[in-house]
Amino acid sequence: MKNLIAILLLAVTLFSTCKKLEIEEGTPNCIRSKISAFEKDAFCSDPQVDEYQFQSEYVYVFIDGSCGADLAATVFDSKCNIKGRLGGIEGNTKINGEEFNSAKFIKTVWKK
């Protein structure tokens, strides 16, 4: 009986510590990998990754969250090439010389 209880407690502990990231279907594999690393390294409690259509391609904006006023969001293309950074202390609003406000929001692909 003691062995059964010990096994059940171990199983409950293992299953409760395993947390699968809920990433939207269709997200490129390299972006999924970046999200996994981003989730582990995030220092804000509310990071997220949003998908946009911008300059004839899909891009992914990695937003650190709201715990700092001057945090920059990194923009990647679907092959994980950095397109640029938005915001930050300099308040950048352009990627490749074009205002990012022309981007079309598609969806949030991951949120902590």
Could you tell me what each predicted segment is?
Residues 1-2, 19:
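N-terminal hydrophobic targeting signals that begin at the initiator methionine
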Residues 2-8:
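Sec-dependent signal peptide recognition
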Residues 14-17:
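C-terminal motif of bacterial Sec signal peptides marking the signal peptidase cleavage site
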Residues 19-112:
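N- and C-terminal low-complexity/disordered segments
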